[in-house]
From Swiss-Prot:
HAMAP family: Lipoyl_synth, Lipoyl_synth_plantM. GO terms for molecular function: 4 iron, 4 sulfur cluster binding; lipoate synthase activity; metal ion binding. NCBIfam families: lipA, PRK05481.1, PRK12928.1. The gene is LIP1. PANTHER family: LIPOYL SYNTHASE (PTHR10949), LIPOYL SYNTHASE, MITOCHONDRIAL (PTHR10949:SF0). Its cofactor is [4Fe-4S] cluster. This is Lipoyl synthase, mitochondrial.
């Protein structure tokens, strides 16, 4: 009995006074106290397993950007609850299912899914207007930038673009029976032409297969390179879109450091200069990022001064906890005031509402009508 008490006391002292001792050393300690304890067989990992483990840890580890984005400034402890007007509808319908199946078959990506757009089902099925639309994302699914609002994955060195993607995208879109398509892309700062050639080729191939389809290109800023802007603007599209994302004062808080307000405005001006007559330019901003009404008005005035034809306002929705928080949920009444203000400023069309996104079915329905009206006028003039 005395021997057992002595053994227990020795074990307690060893565990209490040697907290730095690793778990792997416990068997040898037990053997010292009780020689009858069997020794486990050593099984050191192979070099290959170690290399694989390092790769997995590196892939799963949070980046500095993840850490930065997860830090919320201010005293709010809980995210704002969603108001009743932000209810989302469940995607569905035969056309929705058909488009989704074709996307999986050809391994294509849509920003509708990547960005978790709440209007996905409505746009793909055609909704009330009957104008079914979709937004295809080309140049891969990995962006070279890391904006604080965006859910698309990022990397400094994404995989190279698929050379067959322009043909695959054109064939898929031509088979869907859509009337209006939005083609967008991730930023590709790693490519010499920022991906503009790939973009233009996709538009051109689609025009060959389905010349009557209306095409909107929602492009990155191409780092402001005029040659890249010209390449896409003259590719045969009907709408050249580039989003400024937020008001001028919040650009550095919301967007990647390589993007800025002046560069985006210059891209929209260049597009208007290079594109054929009748091509519309378009941009969009999110509300609920911390902007003031005066900042929204000032930014909208500068966008209109750049000759932009179409503008949309929508509510920022936080994709995950590592993204910037929602500052406020802007009311439908406020969105309507911004819409009315934009119309008064001279925009040809303004879409404004909590669920509006830059690529939005209802907006595309009206843009389609505008383009067709312009075509009719041009035909009459001839």
């Amino acid at each position: 009995m005395h021997g057992r008490r002595h053994l227990a006391a020795s074990l307690a002292r060893a565990l209490t006074y040697a907290p730095s001792r690793s778990i792997s050393s416990t068997p040898s300690l037990l053997q010292t106290l009780d020689p009858s304890t069997p020794s486990p067989a050593a099984a050191p990992p192979t070099a290959g397993r170690l290399a694989e483990l390092r790769q997995r840890l590196q892939a799963d580890a949070p980046s500095l950007g993840d850490f930065t984005y997860s830090v919320e400034v201010g005293t709010r402890k809980k995210p704002l609850p969603k108001p009743k007007w932000m209810k989302e509808t469940i995607p569905g319908g035969a056309k929705y299912a058909g488009i989704k199946a074709k996307l999986r078959e050809l391994k294509l990506h849509t920003v509708c899914e990547e960005a978790r757009c709440p209007n996905l089902g409505e746009c793909w099925s055609g909704g009330e207007t009957g104008t079914a639309t979709a937004t295809i994302m080309i140049l891969g699914d990995t962006c070279t930038r890391g904006c604080r609002f965006c859910n698309v994955k990022t990397s400094r060195t994404p995989p190279p673009p698929d050379p067959d993607e322009p043909s695959n995208v054109a064939q898929a879109i031509a088979s869907w029976g859509l009337e209006y398509i939005v083609i967008t892309s991730v930023d590709r700062d790693d490519l010499p032409d920022q991906g503009s050639g790939h973009f233009a080729e996709t538009v051109q191939k689609l025009k060959v297969l389905k010349p009557e389809m209306l095409i909107e290109a929602l492009v990155p800023d191409f780092r402001g390179d005029p040659a890249c802007v010209e390449k896409v603007a003259t590719s045969g599209l009907h709408v050249f879109a580039h989003n400024i994302e937020t008001v001028e004062e919040l650009q550095r808080n919301v967007r990647d450091h390589r993007a800025n307000f002046k560069q985006s405005i210059d891209v929209l001006k260049l597009a208007k200069e290079y594109a054929p007559a009748g091509t519309l330019t378009k941009t969009s901003i999110m509300l609920g990022c911390g902007e003031t009404p005066d900042q929204v008005i000032s930014t909208t005035e500068k966008v209109r001064a750049a000759g932009v034809d179409v503008m949309t306002f929508g509510q920022y929705m936080r994709p995950s906890k590592r993204h910037m928080p929602v500052s406020e949920y802007v009311t439908p009444e406020a969105f309507e005031r911004y819409r009315s203000l934009g119309v008064d400023m001279g925009f040809r069309y303004v879409a404004s509402g909590p669920m509006v996104r830059s690529s939005y079915k209802a907006g595309e329905f009206y843009i389609k009508a505008m383009i067709e009206a312009d075509r009719a006028k041009a035909t009459t003039a001839i």
